[in-house]
Amino acid sequence: MEHLRISVDIAGLWLRRRPEEKLDKEFTYAKLVELARKGDVAETRRIFDTPYARPTPTKIPAGHLFLDGLPRGSYQASLDLGTAVASFSQKGTTMLRAFLCMGRPVGVLMLPEAYRDAELTVERPSFGNGTQAAEAGNSVSPGSLQQLALPDANLETEDGMIGFFQKVDDRTAYTLLCKKCGTTLYYTAVQAENIEKASQLAKLELCAAEDMGADKLLQQHKRWWQQYWGKSSLQLPDETLEQLWYRANYFLAAGSEPGNAPMPLQGVWCADDDQLPPWKGDYHNDLNTQFTYCHYLTANHPEQGKVFLDYLWSLRPQAAKFARAFYGTAGECLPSVMDIDGGALGLSLIHISEPTRH
């Protein structure tokens, strides 16, 4: 291992920009039925499948951290579900502990004293500059991040902090900052409506984390998870199924913090390979989101379920608009495949043609 690469993401970080080519005016349920009766597959795909092939709107990654200075060789990674603390070890010796603070957008990396000289660097995703044309990708592999034209990031190297500030579009900017304090490394990724606000919030978060210190942050973090796991438990004769239940509840908590975007698919849905995320990281309003949240009441976690319900409730205007445009009727109905703002994205007919999926 030359260095440890850490992917950093923000649940609601999207490039919302819509292409100039809007959805066809015949993107309606009535037209879909008409074409189905005619057996016109080509026209059906043109109207309903083609929009999904465009690179935007899409979920985007926030960036990477690189940690250099640890011994070379093989490592073992593990996650303690009870405390939500990850460990990175070599030959039985823990080389790194990591956790994401519940309730605040701060990550903490804790090193042994012997590796206090390890170096941390930050890397922006490989967004494009507008020179690369859209690729002929598919829903699973939509193509390179180079298709996305984003302005250059502003670098930060002051007050012991390193990172960058990135404008995404007219509505969104974000900051990825980190700071090394001895054997502890703090990092944060914050989204806001402009660079100035994102920068201000990120610096406040890092300063507050440094003032509190890693040990107190870890105590606070463990206390939160202890209370969370104390609300329900499960014992099954099948250990694999039992672990599946606990993992599902871990994802439910980790991906459903109040005030943030809910999970589209069992957690943050993004790629870490300089590619657009599979299925654009979008919201499939079918079993994909239903299975993620359907158990929140039986597991006694209403606060996490409320994150998803509040999100859907906020999209009621878009739901009414889609009901009129697609079905030609009053009421409220969200697309079964949508962006973070509730806009229809298209996709294969199995996802958009059945009213019961919406």
Feature annotation, model-predicted:
Residues 1-347:
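Aromatic-residue-lined binding/catalytic grooves and analogous aromatic/hydrophobic interfacial grooves
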